[in-house]
Amino acid sequence: VTEAADLGPQRAEGRFGIATTFAFIIVAVSLVAPASPGAQLVSTVGLILLPGLLLTSLIVPWGITGLRKLLLATGIGITLFCFVGAAAGAIGPYLGVSRPLSRVPLLVVWLVLLAMLAAVAVVRRADPVGDLLAGHPRRSLWWIAALAVPPCIALVGATELNATSSNTIATAATVLGLGLVFASVAFSRRIGEGLQAGFVGSAVVTLVWQIPTRGGWLWGWDIQHEFSVAAATIAAGRFPIPHSHDPYAGMLSLTVLPAQLHFLNAIQLRTILVLVPGVLLAACAVTTLLTIRRILGPTGSALLVALLIVGTTSFLTELPALMRQCVALFLFTVVIQLVSDPTAPIRRVRVLAAVLGLGLAVSHYSTAYMSAAAVVVAWLFGLVLRAHWSRRVLTAPVAASFAGAALIWGLVVA
């Protein structure tokens, strides 16, 4: 079980980016293929994960491996996905494209970008996909498939509850979710890091998806505002939304992100607002687990995350209704994981931290302000301790990038 769960492959020398290039081809094919659940899943995951994984591997070729690298790549990929869409939406009208955030223009942009990234992988002999998969036994895939079952049961249970008022399957899904949380603590010393993280991630998705999928309407006190802004972006097919003075319209997590998922992957807006927050919250919990595991060990970290999941009302009942905050919280947890990793090359980590700061700034204003304040305080604390700058990730330029991005985007651009 431990071998199946550990996600720390060694980098293979002499590769020519074969696995990564093949993965880019699969994503490109899924983009142009007729809409189906399989194609939607592959294209959605691939558009965010593959570019982020390649860029992360090029910037930090060593020091960060396995699941930590996968989470970091997801954060970088979300940031890139948002900024590419924003650039396309803003520049397109000046090139004569009236609706640049519609399917055909976005397909052209992303197919060209995917081809360029695949070429970079070949030229630089970078194969992050191959590195990630190297040395993993087949039973790892079985664990991944098994842990995907409880979230699916949660969706089936919600559907049955909506249609027949029977809560049998929904109750079973809840029991499974709580059981996974318990297993992550009870068996923390007998399973590997990856499997423990898998238990936590599957549990969060299973429990969170139980709430917004029930009933025939979107759920949440602020969901009307989020939905209207996202729908206006999709209707306009461009960014910024013409003649809009709504501050929410400046958040790429509510405008460009759902618009691209809708047009590129044929995913309905309601589906995006219902399912994506649960996945992001699961990623937050997993990232938190891996970050504090270095300090508290497998049992202490699992217990603390379990308390976060089942002991915090807002985590399961309030945050799933705030997609913009879920995006920002995930990026912030990745920043904390990144700056607290003692194995990562410090200078290159500073670059990735600054990039994630940009992603925070365009995702959620309040989280961006608080994150910037936390980074500035941490930088000042490092000065008080007189730690040499070469040993500090949060230097003055990094702190300035967080604060500057939050202030400029929140107060000027938006």
Predicted regions span which residues?
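Membrane-embedded, hydrophobic transmembrane alpha-helices
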Residues: 1-192
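Transmembrane-lumen/periplasm boundary regions of multi-pass, lipid-linked membrane glycan transferases
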Residues: 226-229, 387, 399-414
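Membrane-interface alpha helices of multi-pass inner-membrane proteins
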Residues: 156, 338, 350-365
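Transmembrane helix irregularities
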Residues: 264-265, 295, 311, 359-367, ...
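Hydrophobic core segments of transmembrane alpha-helices in multi-pass, intramembrane catalytic enzymes
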Residues: 44, 48, 174-177, 281, ...
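Membrane-interface transmembrane helices that cradle and orient dolichyl/undecaprenyl
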Residues: 332-349
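Perimembrane helix-loop-helix junctions
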Residues: 338, 371-402
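Active-site lumenal/periplasmic loops and adjacent helix-entry segments of GT-C-fold
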Residues: 161-167, 184-330
